[in-house]
Amino acid sequence: MTSVVVIGTQWGDEGKGKITDFLSQDAEVIARYQGGDNAGHTIVIDGKKFKLHLIPSGVFFPEKISVIGNGVVVNPKSLVKELEYLHTEGVSTENLRISDRAHVILPYHIKLDQLQEAAKGDNKIGTTNKGIGPAYMDKAARVGIRIADLLDKEIFASRLKTNLAEKNRLFSKMYESEELSFDEIFEEYYAYGQQIKQYVTDTSVILNDALDAGKRVLFEGAQGVMLDIDQGTYPFVTSSNPVAGGVTIGSGIGPSKINKVVGVCKAYTSRVGDGPFPTELFDEVGERIREVGHEYGTTTGRPRRVGWFDSVVMRHSRRVSGITNLSLNCIDVLSGLDTVKICVAYDLDGERIDYYPASLEQLKRCKPIYEELPGWEEDITGCRSLDELPENARNYVRRIGELVGIRISTFSVGPGREQTNILESVWSNI
């Protein structure tokens, strides 16, 4: 039994897709366990970029099984579009498996998401308007439609009719918006269900059988710990649990079957949308990092907010997810800066604190306490070991490991597979 979980430790966009793709080379099964097509990951293979939102990174390895677990909310329209995109690019999807227990995102979820966000005005959360939150709301309210229901024509029609009647009352009475058509949704989405039917199964059985057989299973998280609905910057969070504990609920395996947790982070910090961000930069340094790092959302295309590396955030992520290994990405983006900074603690009303407050009001008053280190001018994109890094870059990497309290197992100096460097194999000693 060998399993590794890959999670984002910041606010998403840390490069999980690339690290998952890299670790997938030694895995036999790769699974997603939460989120939906609000996630976006970019994989570079032989210099070519592939952008995925739902399908796990492991799909590029035809000999491995890729799983969309029960904790994922699936937009069938987006899924079919992504499958067609992969087929057009010559990528086989015969190795894909989709949980019959996963919940379905329907047009009324997307419309409700958009209307609710617009109604919030200045208090908007910064949702991607993909219907993720409303789909999870229906799941919690026990009125959601699952993949298994989508494949059964009579059950899908019955549940869709009931749900749509309720949602249309909401649209017309509360939001004074146009109602949606039952016939249009039913015909379109039942057809999508038939197109994905070949991939649908009980994925919990597949995952547990693989683990019991001693196979290497890799779990791929979406978003990041700071967007977790329980442990993140609530309410500026997603509607699921990206933390490592979400694996057990979202994939159908027991907690005793998780061996290692790899936390992925950037050498700086970024986030999309609204919410607290203590180390955010508003100056020319921030603009430089954004442009050099191509910090624009994979899903939304929105410019990401950027800031210095925050070890307070990282220690919080380590604690709530039990992170055993750290993967540090995008070190190359900081090349050329005279000085680099790491937030080591916060100043809250004159008191030094080293934890991340739950209160948004307290977070607004938190001022980052920085440790400054000398930067480096060298181009490090060709470095293939820690020793090859310039001394200042090497010291920066080591200091991050010390402050976070996690050993760094991989570091990357660019988007390519060959630019990801192993210091310690996470598959060893399990």
Swiss-Prot record:
Matches recorded under Gene3D superfamilies: Adenylosuccinate Synthetase, subunit A, domain 1, Adenylosuccinate Synthetase, subunit A, domain 2, Adenylosuccinate Synthetase, subunit A, domain 3
Pfam families the UniProt entry points to: Adenylsucc_synt
GO MF terms, alphabetically ordered: adenylosuccinate synthase activity; GTP binding; magnesium ion binding
E.C. no: 6.3.4.4
PROSITE patterns: ADENYLOSUCCIN_SYN_1, ADENYLOSUCCIN_SYN_2
Organism name: Streptococcus thermophilus (strain ATCC BAA-250 / LMG 18311)
NCBIfam families with a match to the protein in the record: PRK01117.1 (NF002223), purA (TIGR00184)
Active site positions, chain numbering: D13, H41
Name of encoding gene: purA
The organism's taxonomic lineage, starting at the top: Bacteria, Bacillati, Bacillota, Bacilli, Lactobacillales
Cysteine-cysteine disulfides: none
Residues reported in the UniProt entry to bind Mg(2+): D13, G40
Cofactor annotation comment: Binds 1 Mg(2+) ion per subunit.
Annotated GTP binding sites: 12-18, 40-42, 304, 330-332, 412-414
Keyword Oxidoreductase assigned: no
Name of this protein: Adenylosuccinate synthetase
Major location (coarse): cytoplasm
GO BP field: 'de novo' AMP biosynthetic process; IMP metabolic process
Catalytic activity, as annotated: IMP + L-aspartate + GTP = N(6)-(1,2-dicarboxyethyl)-AMP + GDP + phosphate + 2 H(+)
Assigned GO CC terms: cytoplasm
Pathway assignment: Purine metabolism; AMP biosynthesis via de novo pathway; AMP from IMP: step 1/2
Binding-site residues, substrate: T298, T299, T300, G301, R302, P303, R304
Family note: Belongs to the adenylosuccinate synthetase family.
Required co-factors: Mg(2+)
Record localization: Cytoplasm
Record's function text: Plays an important role in the de novo pathway of purine nucleotide biosynthesis. Catalyzes the first committed step in the biosynthesis of AMP from IMP.
Annotated residues for binding of IMP: D13, E14, G15, K16, N38, A39, G40, H41, T128, R142, Q223, T238, R302
PANTHER family per UniProt: ADENYLOSUCCINATE SYNTHETASE
Subunit structure: Homodimer.
